[in-house]
């Protein structure tokens, strides 16, 4: 998209680069450094190529200095290593959802999404529709799940082919109405069961009959998956309760599946559950904190992903008794 040529030879051959969207030419490095083009560089990936005689070493130094003194370095290779570590617990056919909400917990959602897409993750998941739209605008084509869809965001969901979590009858009714108004049929959604977390979700004991009735008597939406969330898969003290949760989810999800001819993916294992309950991986698992290097089972680092670096501004020797 952008080409910057330095040197008299390139100055004479400018027409060769007529097909480049943005192109600039300078007689020497000093002219480039003093130009508006250099001062406007921001959020760029820059490839420097040229002989030492051009003095690109001083250019490199100045470009590095343009970076903030406090930076968060994200190691994408470590992300892949963590992904593969958790995949080692899964059967080859088990699908994987990777959580990249809140800008991938500060690691940079677009960059993380591109890396995960390259490594064939089945689903990405973000909190709200705007996050999903940003990924789409940056070329992400993977399935994207929206965990907290807002009723004001339905148009964004449809425009960017984002798949919402459905956790209440109010949300379900509103989304059906919006989809029917747009003439949409068969739009994929993900059904949330509350098996003990008590945040969001349908009660698989008391709500299942009404849920099936509503889903079967419309064709705007289809359940793509059904899922729940372990309360304490990171703590052995909750193992009995986790077993109760799984039993409740297993029964409710099978009842939902029996009402439809197409396959509905089931998932309940999170990062800790993948390691602690591999026998409960079902059709799909959700990988969150573990992807970023934190093992929720012991709070130890698997492969460190993020490193915060800064500069010490000043070191002071303060006499005892002085205020700080």
Language-model features: where?
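N-terminal active-site wall of soluble small-molecule enzyme domains
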Residues: 12, 88-175, 276
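Short, solvent-exposed secondary-structure boundary/capping segments
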Residues: 320-324
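Glycine-rich tight-turn/loop motif centered on a GG-T
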Residues: 64-75, 114, 159-164, 238
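Short hydrophobic/aromatic-enriched beta-strand-loop microsegments
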Residues: 20-28, 67-69, 141-150, 163-168, ...
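Hydrophobic/aromatic residues located in beta-strands of well-ordered beta-sheets
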Residues: 3, 23, 46, 96, ...
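Active-site loop/helix belt of alpha/beta enzymes
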Residues: 71, 78-83, 88-89, 102-115, ...
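Short, acidic/turn-prone active-site loops that include or flank metal/cofactor-
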Residues: 25-32, 72-77, 130, 148-152, ...
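ATP-dependent carboxylate-amine ligase
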Residues: 1-81, 88, 123, 127-129
């Amino acid at each position: 998209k952008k080409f910057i040529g330095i040197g008299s030879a390139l100055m004479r051959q400018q027409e060769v680069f007529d097909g480049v969207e943005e192109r600039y030419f300078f007689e020497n490095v000093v002219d480039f450094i003093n130009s508006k083009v250099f001062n406007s560089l921001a959020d760029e990936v820059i490839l420097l190529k040229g002989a030492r005689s051009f003095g690109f070493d001083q250019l490199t130094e100045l470009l590095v200095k343009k970076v903030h003194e406090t930076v968060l370095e994200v190691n994408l290779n470590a992300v892949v290593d963590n992904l593969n570590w958790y995949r080692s617990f899964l059967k080859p056919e088990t699908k994987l959802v990777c959580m990249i909400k809140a800008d991938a917990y500060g690691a940079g959602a677009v960059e993380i999404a591109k890396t995960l897409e390259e490594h064939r993750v089945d689903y990405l998941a973000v909190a709200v529709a705007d996050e999903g739209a940003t990924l789409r605008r940056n070329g992400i084509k993977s399935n994207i799940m929206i965990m907290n869809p807002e009723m004001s965001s339905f148009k964004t969901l449809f425009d960017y082919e984002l798949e919402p979590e459905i956790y209440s009858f109010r949300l379900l009714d509103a989304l059906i109405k919006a989809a029917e108004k747009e003439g949409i049929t068969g739009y994929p959604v993900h059904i949330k069961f509350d098996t003990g977390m008590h945040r969001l979700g349908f009660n698989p004991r008391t709500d299942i009959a009404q849920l099936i009735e509503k889903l079967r008597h419309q064709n705007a939406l289809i359940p793509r998956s059904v899922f729940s969330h372990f309360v304490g898969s990171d703590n052995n003290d909750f193992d009995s309760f986790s077993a109760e949760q799984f039993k409740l989810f297993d029964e409710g999800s099978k009842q939902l599946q029996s009402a439809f001819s197409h396959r509905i993916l089931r998932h309940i294992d999170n990062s800790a559950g993948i390691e602690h309950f591999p026998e409960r991986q079902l059709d799909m698992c959700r990988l969150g904190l573990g992807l970023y290097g934190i093992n929720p089972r012991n709070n130890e680092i698997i492969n460190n992903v993020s490193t915060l670096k800064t500069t010490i501004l000043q070191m002071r020797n303060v006499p005892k008794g002085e205020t700080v």
